[in-house]
Regions:
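Structural signal for hydrophobic packing residues in well-ordered secondary-structure cores
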Residues: 138, 169, 173-176, 180, ...
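Glycine- and acidic
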Residues: 151-154, 159, 214-220, 329-332
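Conserved, mostly hydrophobic/aromatic
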Residues: 25, 57, 92, 134, ...
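C-terminal extensions of enzymes
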Residues: 1-19, 27-31, 42-43, 146-152, ...
Length: 371
C-alpha cells in the first residue's frame, strides 16, 4: 500500500472528512497524533496506544538523531520495527527542537550548527542531513527542515526565515528525489511566515509550486494567541491545494480542535494531553479536573461519567488522587490513557459531525462545556 489522500465529505464550515492511506494503514482525518518524542508516548505501551485506536503517532528526529542515533534505528529495521509499532508514524525534521532546546545555535543558509542539550557536543543539521536521518528512521510521513522563530518577531525577521525555509524546502525536495522512496515515505513542505498573513500566503504559494504531496503549517502556537494561530492558518490553507493533506503543527487545547478543523486542517499534534496528564490535569466533558485538589479525596466518581475509556470504567477520582499524591508511576499511566482517549474521542465526534454537516453545532456545544 502506497499513499493516497481523498476528501470524502466537506462540511459547510469548510472542514474536510478524509482518508489518508499509508504503507502502515489508513488514517481517518481529521486526525490527532499523540506525541512519542523518543520513540515512545510517555507512560503508554504500544499495546495501550493500539487499544486507544491511535492510527498515527509523532516521533522526533532531533531526539532520535542524538539518542540512540538514526544509524542504529536503521540497522534495527527502521523506527516501526525498533519500537514495535505497526501503524503509521510521522517524524518532524528536528527544526523546532534545534531552535527551542539547543544552546549556541548558529543559522546560515547552509543549515544550523547547534550544541546537543544532552552532552554539549556540536552538530550540524542541513536540509539534506535532516532528510538523511528521516529516511533512515523510515517514518511514513516526514518533514522538511524549517527555521522556527520566536513569536512575535519583526516582519523582516519573519521574511528572512520564511525565505530560508523555502530554499531549504527546495533542497529537501531535490535530495528526496535522489535518495528517498515516494512509495514508502511522504514528504511534507512547511509553510512559515510568522504572524504576517500576507507573508504566509506568499510562502504557501511558493511552496505549492514545489508540488509536495502534503503541507504542514509551522511556527504557530509558540506564544501567539489562538486568534492569531487561526488567522495565520486561514491565510495558509487558503492557498494550499484541496487534494493534499494539511497538518497544523503543535496544537492545541481540546476546545480549539474544531476551530482548526473548520480552517481545512486534516492533522494535528500536541504534547498537551500527555504532559498535562503527568501533572495531574485531566480533561473531561465538563472541563478540566486537577486531581490533586482535596475535593476529590473521597470522590467515588470516575474522572468523567460520560467517558468510555478503560480508566473511567474502573477507577475513582479518589484513587487517582491518591496515586498522584503518592508519586506512583500508575498515576501517569492512567491519567495519560484517559487524556489521549479524550482527545481521540473529540476527533471521532468531529469526523461524525462533518459527515452529517453538523460541525458548527458540535463545536458550539463542545466549547460551551469546556470554556
Amino acid at each position: 500500500m502506497g499513499f493516497q489522500f481523498e476528501v470524502i465529505a466537506t462540511d459547510p464550515t469548510g472542514a474536510r472528512l478524509g482518508r489518508l492511506r499509508t504503507p502502515h494503514g489508513i488514517i481517518e482525518t481529521p486526525a490527532f497524533m499523540p506525541v512519542g518524542t523518543a520513540a515512545t508516548v510517555k507512560a503508554q505501551t504500544q499495546a495501550d496506544l493500539e487499544s486507544l485506536g491511535v492510527q498515527i503517532l509523532l516521533s522526533n528526529t532531533y531526539h532520535l538523531y542524538l539518542r540512540p542515533g538514526h544509524e542504529l534505528i536503521r540497522d534495527m529495521g527502521g523506527l516501526h520495527s525498533f519500537m514495535s509499532w505497526p501503524r503509521a508514524i510521522l517524524t518532524d525534521s528536528g527544526g523546532y527542537q534545534v531552535f527551542s532546546l539547543s544552546e549556541l545555535r548558529k543559522v546560515t543558509n547552509e543549515g544550523v550548527t547547534f550544541r546537543s542539550h544532552l552532552d554539549g557536543t556540536t552538530h550540524f543539521l542541513s536540509p539534506e542531513k535532516a532528510l538523511e536521518v528521516e529516511i533512515a528512521l523510515g517514518a511514513d510521513i516526514i518533514m522538511v527542515l524549517d527555521e522556527c522563530i520566536e513569536a512575535p518577531s519583526a516582519e523582516q525577521r519573519a521574511r528572512e526565515a520564511a525565505a530560508r525555509t523555502l530554499d531549504w524546502a527546495r533542497r529537501s525536495r531535490e535530495y528526496f528525489a535522489k535518495h528517498g522512496d515516494s512509495a514508502q515515505q511522504m514528504l511534507f513542505g512547511i509553510v512559515q511566515g510568522g504572524t504576517y498573513p500576507e507573508l504566509r500566503r506568499e510562502n504557501a504559494d511558493a511552496l505549492v509550486e514545489l508540488n509536495f504531496p502534503g503541507y504542514a503549517i509551522g511556527g504557530l502556537a509558540v506564544g501567539d494567541s489562538h486568534n492569531i494561530t487561526c488567522d495565520m492558518t486561514r491565510a495558509a490553507t487558503s492557498r494550499l491545494p484541496a487534494d493534499r493533506p494539511r497538518y497544523l503543527m503543535g496544537v492545541g487545547r481540546p476546545e480549539q480542535l474544531p476551530d482548526y478543523v473548520t480552517l481545512g486542517i486534516d492533522m494535528m499534534d500536541c504534547v498537551l494531553p500527555t504532559r498535562s496528564a503527568r501533572h495531574g490535569c485531566l480533561y473531561t466533558s465538563q472541563g478540566r479536573v486537577l486531581i490533586k485538589n482535596a475535593r476529590y479525596s473521597n470522590d467515588s466518581r470516575p474522572i468523567d461519567e460520560k467517558c468510555g475509556c478503560a480508566v473511567c470504567q474502573r477507577y475513582s477520582r479518589a484513587y487517582l488522587r491518591h496515586l498522584y499524591l503518592a508519586g506512583e508511576t500508575l498515576a501517569a499511566i492512567l491519567n495519560t490513557h484517559h487524556n489521549i482517549y479524550f482527545y481521540l474521542d473529540i476527533m471521532r465526534g468531529i469526523r461524525e459531525a462533518i459527515r452529517f454537516g453538523k460541525l458548527e453545532r458540535f463545536r458550539s456545544d463542545l466549547q460551551a462545556r469546556l470554556t
